[in-house]
Design a protein with these regions (language model features):
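Phosphate/pyrophosphate-binding catalytic cores of soluble transferases and nucleic-acid-acting enzymes
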Residues: 1-323
Length: 323
């Protein structure tokens, strides 16, 4: 995991002219990937994913990779930062920013236009604002102290630390397991003890578009998509991951589909309990995504919101008009 301090990361983020980054963000099930692919196909662009779970190989149905959507008229639109690490590992913000810059520089060096697309607000904001990152070591003593605490107690501790740090790094409602909560507390504690010097940020030059979907339509699409993913073999996918040696605790750590379906597979939940709890969790997740994006606006990011109900042609024309 990484800590954020808004200052230039290194020399290649400082004073170097950069191609303006097109960014498309929005909550889950709003159609942002389809829009990014259609726009990329029209502009000859390449897509950089901003999804914290699509980086994992073999985690396909549960993360909604839908790689067939990147093919338009038989031609694949190039994409980056999907399927780059093994399941069971812990990918983090520090690695994402490093990998993003490598992909961005590669795309620009070939004269192409990069499009950043995803729903992981923390990743997007760190890239757009050019946050400097440093790794946070594990704190065995603190972990031992927190071991055995309930998720409710851990969440309250995290809230108190966030207030002390004036931190927006961790959305407490995203911390849906004790393992995640302990790591978040570890990071916030480190931040409190190692206050970083604040300097002006060196942002990536970007124009940001958001897809605004009607709340009830979003809920309908989320529920429909969950049924489709289960029908398409999401349970079998998670069984395969477990059979390949990925620990249940690692899959639970990834949250949402991987948390609840794993708990079903190992017998902790019935199918009906899994389905009901997972559906609620995804709806809550989409709400938290919108909360983060609104927070980005309050922190100075200008987001041009597009009605998700518009036809694809109108959305693309509106984006092109503003480029």
């Amino acid at each position: 995991m990484a800590i954020l301090s808004p200052q230039p990361t290194n020399a290649d983020l400082s004073n170097k002219p950069r191609t303006r980054l097109i960014t498309i963000l929005g909550p889950t099930a709003c159609g942002k990937t389809a829009l990014a692919v259609a726009l990329a196909n029209e502009l000859g662009s390449e897509i950089i994913s901003a999804d914290s779970r699509q980086v994992y190989r073999g985690m396909d149905i549960g993360t909604g990779k839908d790689l067939e959507d990147y093919v338009v008229d038989g031609k694949r639109v190039p994409y980056h930062l999907i399927d780059i690490v093994e399941p069971g590992s812990k990918y983090n913000l520090y690695r994402y920013q490093r990998d993003f810059m490598a992909a961005y520089d590669d795309i620009v060096s070939r004269g192409a236009q990069p499009i950043l697309c995803g729903g992981t607000g923390l990743y997007i904001e760190a890239v757009l604002k050019g946050y400097a990152l440093s790794t946070v070591p594990q704190n065995p003593a603190l972990r031992k102290q927190l071991e055995g605490e309930s998720l409710e107690t851990l969440t309250q501790k995290l809230v108190e630390l966030k207030k002390k740090n004036n931190s927006n790094m961790h959305n407490t409602t995203d911390v849906d397991s004790c393992q995640r909560a302990i790591r978040a507390i570890e990071i916030e504690t480190y931040n409190l003890e190692h206050t970083a010097e604040r300097r002006p940020a060196q942002p990536v030059d970007a124009i940001v578009f958001g897809l605004d979907i009607d709340r009830e339509e979003r809920r309908r699409k989320i529920s429909e998509r969950l049924r489709q993913r289960l029908d398409n073999g999401m349970v079998d996918e998670i069984k395969r991951l477990l059979d390949s040696g990925v620990a249940p605790t690692d899959l639970i750590y990834y949250g949402l589909e991987y948390k609840y379906v794993t708990e079903y597979v190992i017998g902790k939940l019935s199918f009906d309990e899994m389905y009901r709890q997972l559906e609620i969790a995804i709806h809550q997740f989409a709400k938290r995504q919108m909360t983060w994006f609104r927070g980005m606006e309050r922190r100075g990011t200008d987001i041009h919101w597009l009605d998700a109900a518009l036809c694809m042609e109108k959305k693309i024309n509106e984006i092109k008009r503003m480029l």
